[in-house]
């Protein structure tokens, strides 16, 4: 069940692989994400010292859940993956011109997980072509629908 989706990522990138990662979150962040108060629109994933970090994900704190601390809505959050997965992703990102983008935040067995995609950027004409293809699929469905 998806909590937050990054639709802009599918518009701006060709997603080639998807990976599920855990995230190191604080208590107030978990409560806010469960309430749907997170945004992935301008978020991205970087590699630092062989670890993955989520940058730019905005989590608006709940007033009731964050009274005793000073919450930082856009703090850097560490992502948790197996070491082999991280090594493979680092190799592709550094060598082949790929980037890592967050696709959505969802639950899995009661835990909050982040789906990241190994992606290649789209050019402007690729974006136009994708949009034309989507429109054609919608028109096809509309024409095939019984009246």
UniProtKB/Swiss-Prot annotation:
Q: Which Pfam families match?
A: SmpB
One GO term of the biological process aspect: trans-translation
A GO CC term? cytosol
Q: Signal peptide span per the entry? A: none
Q: Where in the cell is it found?
A: Cytoplasm
- Give the CDD domains listed for this entry: SmpB (cd09294)
Q: Which GO terms describe its molecular function?
A: RNA binding
Q: Any transmembrane segments, and where?
A: none
Q: Which UniProt keywords apply?
A: Cytoplasm, RNA-binding
Q: What does this protein do?
A: Required for rescue of stalled ribosomes mediated by trans-translation. Binds to transfer-messenger RNA (tmRNA), required for stable association of tmRNA with ribosomes. tmRNA and SmpB together mimic tRNA shape, replacing the anticodon stem-loop with SmpB. tmRNA is encoded by the ssrA gene; the 2 termini fold to resemble tRNA(Ala) and it encodes a 'tag peptide', a short internal open reading frame. During trans-translation Ala-aminoacylated tmRNA acts like a tRNA, entering the A-site of stalled ribosomes, displacing the stalled mRNA.
> What PANTHER family does the annotation carry?
SSRA-BINDING PROTEIN, TMRNA-BINDING COMPONENT OF TRANS-TRANSLATION TAGGING COMPLEX
**Similarity-based family:** Belongs to the SmpB family.
The name of this protein is SsrA-binding protein
């Amino acid at each position: 069940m998806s909590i937050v989706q990054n639709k802009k990522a599918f518009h701006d990138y060709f997603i080639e692989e998807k990976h599920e990662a855990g995230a190191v979150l604080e208590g107030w962040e978990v409560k806010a994400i469960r309430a749907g108060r997170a945004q992935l629109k301008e978020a991205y994933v970087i590699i630092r010292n062989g670890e993955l970090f989520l940058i730019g994900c905005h989590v608006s704190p709940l007033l009731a859940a964050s009274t005793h601390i000073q919450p930082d809505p856009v703090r850097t959050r560490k992502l948790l993956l197996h070491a082999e997965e991280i090594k493979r992703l680092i190799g592709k990102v550094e060598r082949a011109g790929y980037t890592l983008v967050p696709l959505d935040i969802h639950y899995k067995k009661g835990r909050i997980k982040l789906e990241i995609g190994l992606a290649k950027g789209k050019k402007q004409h690729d974006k136009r072509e994708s949009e034309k293809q989507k429109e054609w699929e919608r028109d096809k469905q509309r024409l095939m629908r019984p009246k």
